[in-house]
Curated annotation (Swiss-Prot):
The chain crosses the membrane at residues 23-43, 158-178, 189-209, 217-237, 258-280, 290-312. This is Protein translocase subunit SecF. One of its GO terms (cellular component) is plasma membrane. Gene3D superfamilies: Multidrug efflux transporter AcrB transmembrane domain (1.20.1640.10). Belongs to the SecD/SecF family. SecF subfamily. It comes from Prochlorococcus marinus (strain SARG / CCMP1375 / SS120). It is a multi-pass membrane protein. The keyword Transmembrane applies. Keywords: Cell inner membrane, Cell membrane, Membrane, Protein transport, Translocation, Transmembrane, Transmembrane helix, Transport. Forms a complex with SecD. Part of the essential Sec protein translocation apparatus which comprises SecA, SecYEG and auxiliary proteins SecDF. Other proteins may also be involved. Its main location: membrane. It comes from the Bacteria. Part of the Sec protein translocase complex. Interacts with the SecYEG preprotein conducting channel. SecDF uses the proton motive force (PMF) to complete protein translocation after the ATP-dependent function of SecA. It holds the Pfam family SecD_SecF_C.
Length: 321
């Protein structure tokens, strides 16, 4: 089925070639902000990495407690919890030292507490929970969760995650290189790098401002974003290639503009329907899936932008065959 215009006086929904400098400015600014986020995160003494690593990668012990409250839970502060740790008589003196740098976070309107510290033994974790209960009040039956990951296992998981990301992106690069010519492949890979970089940059800033951490779920989100981005880009490339073969009256810039206009509605509809369940996860998916859904939603938006704006705008630099 041909989608080429019957005449050359076609009105483009979005004229990429005319607005390409604006597209480059927007993407360039987003990439610059992302690199700044990496820099400030790396130089931050409390982080020391481009992204704030989560419990999965750093190891340690994570304790989640749910308080028993009739309606609203009374407000307590991290100072109250720290004082409880200082006043507690732990059987092991090293426990107090481990809790000195513990991260304390309140969830669900002070109904739940999250404590993250260097690795604790089961007996130490039990004593920590008892000391918190003295300040926070009674806890829900079964509302206690204790997880421990050794630093060696955490480092191994981080290494495995990075390798899996590298392998996945390499496979995508090979697929694109086989499917399209060299120039198309280069721009598609650039778009993939652009999408992943910006999502990571946003989470870098979130780690600095809001102490948001990245974990293994974030790596899954990046892999999903890569696949989604490539799929959208391939659709636009296929339309450009089809028009390039069938329409000889148009120059290459016109072909790119028409291909973008022809796929714009499809891309927006696909992105919109993909965002709907992600929005539901953001509001109703709980704390575990919250940032995972945020990362995916951001990736869908950025991926759509690169597919219908950034890559086609770069293709307009290509000379006529």
């Amino acid at each position: 089925m041909s989608f080429t215009p019957k005449n050359l006086n076609v009105k483009y929904t979005f004229n990429v070639s005319r607005n390409r400098s604006k597209v480059w400015l927007i993407s360039g600014f987003a990439v610059l902000i992302s690199f700044l986020g990496f820099f400030f995160s790396w130089t931050n003494q409390s982080i020391g990495f481009p992204l704030r690593p989560g419990f999965d990668f750093t190891g340690g012990t994570q304790i989640i407690l749910e308080r028993k409250c009739d309606s609203e839970c009374n407000k307590i502060t991290t100072i109250n919890i720290s004082e409880a740790f200082n006043n507690a008589k732990f059987s092991n003196q090293e426990t107090s030292q481990k809790l000195f740098d513990a991260r304390i976070q309140f969830l669900d309107g002070y109904k739940s507490l999250l404590i993250r510290s260097p690795e604790l033994s089961p007996s130490e974790s039990k004593e920590v929970i008892e000391s918190i209960e003295f300040v926070a009040g009674p806890l829900e039956d079964g509302g206690q969760s204790v997880e421990s990951i050794g630093p060696t296992l955490g480092a191994k998981l981080l290494q495995t995650t990075l390798i899996s990301l590298l392998v996945a992106f390499s496979c995508v690069a090979i697929y694109i290189s086989i499917r399209f010519d060299r120039m198309f492949s280069l721009y598609a890979l650039l778009a993939l790098f652009h999408d992943v970089l910006i999502v990571c940059g946003v989470f870098s800033w979130l780690g600095i401002i809001n102490e948001v951490e990245v974990n293994s779920l974030f790596a899954v989100a990046l892999l999903t974003i890569a696949g989604y981005s490539v799929n959208d880009t391939v659709v636009v490339f296929d339309r450009i290639r089809e028009i390039n073969k069938q329409e000889s009256r148009m120059n290459f810039k016109q072909k790119v503009d028409f291909a973008v206009s022809a796929t714009l509605t499809r891309t927006l509809y696909t992105s919109g329907t993909t965002l709907l369940p992600l929005i539901a996860l953001i509001f109703f998916g709980g704390t575990t899936l919250y940032w995972f859904a945020i990362a995916l939603a951001l990736g869908v938006v950025v991926g759509s932008w690169s597919s219908i704006a950034l890559v086609p705008s770069l293709l307009t630099l290509r000379k006529e065959n």
